[in-house]
Every structure is written in C-alpha cells, then in structure tokens.
C-alpha cells in the first residue's frame, strides 16, 4: 500500500482489525470511563469489602459484562457485579475461589495481566459448585485478569468477562485493567488491611 510521505498511519492490533474511527473512540471512551469510576472507588473506599464491591460495580456495564474482584488476606473474598444483574448467579459466583480458576492463578503466579480472547478451555474461570463451567454459564467469549500485587505478594485479582453481544476484550482493555489494579493496590495499602 502506498502511503503519502510524511504521514503516519496508526497500527491496529489484530483483534481490532476492521474497526473504524468511531469504534476506536467508543473503545477508548468506555475504557477511560471505567478507569475514572474505579479511581473514585479506590479513593473513596473505607474498608476492603467496600473496595471490592465498588470496584466490581465500577467495571460492570459497558466495560465488562461481569467483573470479579478477589481480594483478602487468608481465604480470598470475592465481589461480583454484572451489566445485567442476576443476584442468584452472582451469589453462586462468589463461592468460586481464585485457586479454582486457571486464568487467575496463572496471572497471580506470573504477576502479570493476562488476556484470553477467545476463551479456550471450559474451566478457565473455574466451575460452579454444581460442576458447570463458569464460562459456559456466563456465555463468555473473552476475559482478562490483572493481578493485585503489593510488596511483591499477590493480594488478589480483578477479572473482567465479556459475553455474546459485547466486543472481545482487547489490549486497550487489558492496559486499563492493569491501571485499575494498580489503583486498587494503592487503596489496599492505604487501608492497611481493613
């Protein structure tokens, strides 16, 4: 392709090929809105439980169909929020520990954010107590995890999941999720384990 000299052309990641300018604006707007909402949650939190719940709520909506925030010393505690709330399913999902979710445990072991788009392997996000795969129950097609690492130790993770009618999680989303994890870690340090 012949490009006029002196003009730069923005590269597009493979998972967003075919996006038009309006799609890029929408993607960035949604991501920045999620970052702003999570920043408010991190700044306003007065206890770990509130931080988990408010962060999950900040991410659910246009940024994620489902958001899980696993955080806590000792047994991890999970907050769950959804774009289209399903209180019964959310309650069941709080019982799925991060140790049962290969995508989350891998992110924690490597201390690095991970992206699964498309998700492969039905147990990637764990199984419900009745044996059904979380991925199947949610209808998930992509997910991303950012570990919560403070003082070199894994304190938890933030996971976002996108389902049927949502675009796949991409690298822009993963970068924003990593920033949100950093803000959440700063809030955890500020709260001092409360």
Regions found by a protein language model. Give the residues of each.
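GAF sensory/regulatory domain recognition
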Residues: 3-9, 57, 68-99
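Signal-transmission linkers at sensory-effector interfaces
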Residues: 1-46, 187-194
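A short, aliphatic-rich beta-strand micro-motif
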Residues: 141-149
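Amphipathic alpha-helical coiled-coil segments that mediate homodimerization
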Residues: 34-42, 46-63, 69-73, 100-103, ...
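Regulatory sensory and allosteric helical modules in signal-transduction proteins
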Residues: 77, 87-127, 136
């Amino acid at each position: 392709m012949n490009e006029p000299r002196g003009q730069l052309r923005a590269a597009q990641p493979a998972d967003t090929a075919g996006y038009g300018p309006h799609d890029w604006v929408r993607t960035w707007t949604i991501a920045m809105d999620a970052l702003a909402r999570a920043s408010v949650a991190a700044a306003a939190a007065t206890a770990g439980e509130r931080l988990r719940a408010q962060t999950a709520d900040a991410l659910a909506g246009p940024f994620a169909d489902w958001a899980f925030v696993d955080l806590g010393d000792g047994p991890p505690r999970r907050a769950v929020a959804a774009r289209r709330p399903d209180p019964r399913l959310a309650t069941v999902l709080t019982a799925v520990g991060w140790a049962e979710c290969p995508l989350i445990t891998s992110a924690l072991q490597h201390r690095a954010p991970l992206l699964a788009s498309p998700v492969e392997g039905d147990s990637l996000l764990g199984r419900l107590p009745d044996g059904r795969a979380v991925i199947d129950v949610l209808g998930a097609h992509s997910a991303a995890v950012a570990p919560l690492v403070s003082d070199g130790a894994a304190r938890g993770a933030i996971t976002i999941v996108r389902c049927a009618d949502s675009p796949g999680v991409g690298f822009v989303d993963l970068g924003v999720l990593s920033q949100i994890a950093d803000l959440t870690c700063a809030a955890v340090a500020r709260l001092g384990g409360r």
